[in-house]
Amino acid sequence: MRVGVLGIQGAISEHVEIMRKALGDAGQEGEVVIVKKPEHLEGLNGLIIPGGESTTISSMLKRTGLFEEVRKKAIAGMGIMGTCAGAIMLAKKVFGGNVETLALMDIAVNRNAYGRQVDSFEADVEITGFEKKFRAIF
């Protein structure tokens, strides 16, 4: 399995680290790579778009040529997951901001405003199929 983490902006290293841990904990052989250019998408089974700032991510996806390539790969069947701003980038409808999204998921999200995320936290959560609790960041 080969999984990419979009390396444009946001919590990149955290997503790479936790994906490597998840693969190991599941006994799954695999590689986690950072995606910064369209050619980095080749051979991926999945892509994670991490949190960050959605307007920045959208702008950088377009500048790097990744916007349409990510859409094409996802439509062709590549798995894709987004956390926080990454989830915003996947939504078909966004409230609270003018951001062009990949529009890959039939969901509507309410975009938060700029500023500190004072309610963020980490917790160990139980996930069906995992033998141990999983350290998650919210």
Regions found by a protein language model. Name each.
Residues 1, 97-98, 130:
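Generic structural signal for short, solvent-exposed loop/turn connectors between secondary structure elements
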Residues 54-126:
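Cysteine-nucleophile active-site neighborhood
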Residues 125-138:
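Active-site oxyanion/phosphate-handling segment shared across diverse enzymes
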Residues 5, 34, 82, 103-106, ...:
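Structural signal for conserved beta-strand scaffold positions within catalytic alpha/beta enzyme cores
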